């Protein structure tokens, strides 16, 4: 926080956030300057865990998948997340099966229920993907391709070549 105003979010599984207790972890994260949590496998019904983080002014990032039913989306939104992260595809991250019709429909459903920002991620890796999604979403997350470029070229030359046209597509 000394050098940047960029929000910092802790991401892990529920088990990591409840041992020794959600209250303890929330306190420690808050003391360290974290702004929020993304708990990948946390059901919306776990109000006590969610409230432990909210009590320490830690924002919730809520994951919603293509298979999430409308009633569960409503439950997630009831938890008042700071941000909704829509998973754009079924399967594993980094695969090639974006269904733009399905993504558009689901994002429309989510935006009817909430005015919170919605970012999309999982499977997004090309300039074409970005061009197709940028008007549908409030933000785009590109993970696996960036991690791959960094691991193959620590000098970051390949990463720069990869990211520059994507940034241009977002700005266009």
Regions found by a protein language model. Name each.
Residues 23-24, 68-79, 120, 124-140:
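Catalytic cores of alpha/beta
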Residues 145-172:
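C-terminal helical cap(s) of enzyme catalytic domains, especially alpha/beta-barrels
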């Amino acid at each position: 926080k000394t050098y940047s105003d960029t929000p910092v979010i802790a991401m892990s599984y529920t088990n990591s956030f409840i041992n020794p207790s959600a209250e303890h972890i929330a306190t420690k994260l808050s003391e360290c300057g974290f702004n929020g949590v993304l708990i990948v496998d946390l059901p919306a019904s776990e109000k006590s865990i969610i409230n432990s983080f909210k009590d320490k002014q830690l924002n919730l990032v809520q994951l919603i998948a293509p298979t999430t039913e409308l009633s569960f989306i409503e439950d997630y939104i009831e938890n008042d997340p700071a941000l909704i992260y829509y998973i754009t595809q079924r399967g594993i991250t980094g695969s090639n099966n974006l269904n733009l019709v399905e993504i558009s429909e689901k994002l429309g459903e989510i935006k009817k229920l909430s005015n919170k920002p919605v970012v999309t991620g999982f499977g997004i890796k090309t300039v074409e993907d970005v061009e197709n999604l940028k008007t549908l979403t409030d933000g785009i997350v590109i993970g696996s391709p960036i991690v791959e470029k960094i691991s193959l070229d620590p000098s970051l030359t390949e990463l720069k070549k990869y990211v520059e046209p994507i940034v241009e597509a977002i700005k266009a």
